[in-house]
Amino acid sequence: MTTDAQKRFRELLVEARKDADLTQAELSSRLNRPQSFVSKYERGERRLDVVEFGEVARALGIDPVNFLARLYREIA
């Protein structure tokens, strides 16, 4: 079961990737992961743990604290 917060988290990650002008393949290369890693978390087939989220945020050039603050403002 996917919650609204999980869905919005994924949407914001996709938005951040697109804002960084990166494809899934380009992001996965920065992460040293297969493209399917990015695809699966963006589609909700897998969740990111906190360490993975930090790695994704760094690869996207975003501040993870600000990202989560935005998420929680939007879902409150």
Where are these regions (language model features)?
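Short, charged recognition helix plus adjacent turn
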Residues: 3, 58, 66-76
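Short basic helix-loop element that most often maps to the first helix and adjoining turn
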Residues: 11-30, 55
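Short coil turns linking two alpha-helices in DNA-binding domains
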Residues: 23, 34-37, 63
